[in-house]
Amino acid sequence: MKISHMKKDELFEGFYLIKSADLRQTRAGKNYLAFTFQDDSGEIDGKLWDAQPHNIEAFTAGKVVHMKGRREVYNNTPQVNQITLRLPQAGEPNDPADFKVKSPVDVKEIRDYMSQMIFKIENPVWQRIVRNLYTKYDKEFYSYPAAKTNHHAFETGLAYHTATMVRLADAISEVYPQLNKSLLYAGIMLHDLAKVIELTGPDQTEYTVRGNLLGHIALIDSEITKTVMELGIDDTKEEVVLLRHVILRHHGLLEYGSPVRPRIMEAEIIHMIDNLDASMMMMSTALALVDKGEMTNKIFAMDNRSFYKPDLD
């Protein structure tokens, strides 16, 4: 049974990927395993109580397992309980790739769209910078997630998030023609590109040392600066300063990691579009895991709010 199809208090069984497995202890000092399971429809947490040494050795992150259990809701959070686990037998599903959440849009379609939109960057300085960095990180950009957790945290999530933002910018610029389309496109295409440096990759994603210590905003600004030097572009040109500005401030507030606040329209719009797409993905992901008439689990990145799934046709 798919995770997104599980109903409250329903017994289920099926094959799932262990996304994470943490060994913990109860107050009484007994071992238990805290899991996050996933399939291509979503994720759900569960615990294996009184974990024995052979359980701890066998059920590790990255492995596919057969699981029986009951889907429950605790503190508005869906979870699986009363679980029994075993490893797959010969002939049963065991390829982790089959259990990963995938982009709703095929990566080839995303690649074709992004290539098309790069041509629409009319400013030659911005287009050269974008082309250079997209060539440098082509493989990583079209495979990495956009985050370890929260929004677009799946393989190709980075490219899907970026392409969706470009689509939104394209539509918004028709309503507000005073916006510079080329700056919007270039800024969006580069704003999260350094996630390919900040994160380890699409499998069991973690932060790299540079990701932990510097973060993707500082990393992409450094990449742009190096690219400008390599291309022989004057780094004091207004185009370079504006491009760096819209990227440095795309988190909006200083407390969210941006070193400066937005000072031009395009910077403000990119921040809003980024927040819109991230919020929609987080809400949609959480709502897919609950039934109509239920609340989602609390979403930490959205002020720890729960969201209601209307009981409507």
Model regions: which residues?
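OB-fold nucleic-acid-binding modules
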Residues: 1-12
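Short, acidic/hydrophobic/Gly-rich beta-strand patch recurrent on exposed beta strands
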Residues: 34-39
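Acidic/His-rich, divalent-metal-binding segments that scaffold phosphate/diphosphate chemistry
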Residues: 92-213, 237
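Divalent metal-coordination and catalytic microenvironments
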Residues: 16, 62, 165, 274
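Structural detector for short beta-strands of small beta-barrel domains
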Residues: 10-27
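OB-fold single-stranded nucleic acid-binding module
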Residues: 22-31, 44-45, 51-97
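Divalent metal-dependent catalytic cores for phosphoryl transfer on phosphate-bearing substrates
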Residues: 150-151, 160, 171-290
